[in-house]
Amino acid sequence: MDKVKSYEYFINEREIPDKQGEIIIIMGPPGSGKGTVSKKLASKNGFTHISTGELIRNSKDEDLKKIIAKGDYIPDRIMARMLRRELGKADLESGVVIDGFPRTIKQTKMLDSILGKLGVGLNHCIYLDLSRKKSRERILNRAEKEGREDDKNPDVINKRFDEYENKTKPLLDKYRKSRKLVKINA
């Protein structure tokens, strides 16, 4: 954990010795590249990629989209239900990469419960470390390129950073203590 690797090393050089049943979560501040890294890692290793952010953005539920547009987190029970549904469809034996969950202490417990009921456990938590300044630059660039509405409002961006600092970043200690945390220089 003390050694910080680049995400290119993790994706391109690191071979996962036993892919069967590998469950990986990707965490990091807004704009750190969670979606990009998740997709590359899943593609390289034949894993299923589950992005809770994409699930919400593609949802027909306008209330969920309004919550995101304000920079708030979706309620834990809704996120857990969405993840449980997607994991139920995934090929767990081939491995899964999850980005966007967990984001709260309660969600870590929910994730443990969901995985336990499916007969698998979490193998790694990859933390994409990136400064707030660089994250903000990436978010604004993404807003311009992809037209993501939730990336265009500076107040919403600040709220997302605050939510991350207060609710999500503290989760890293749990995964560090369980020796599942891999820190990546994003």
Indicate residue ranges for each PLM-predicted region:
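Glycine-rich phosphate-binding loop of ATP-dependent small-molecule kinases
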Residues: 1-186
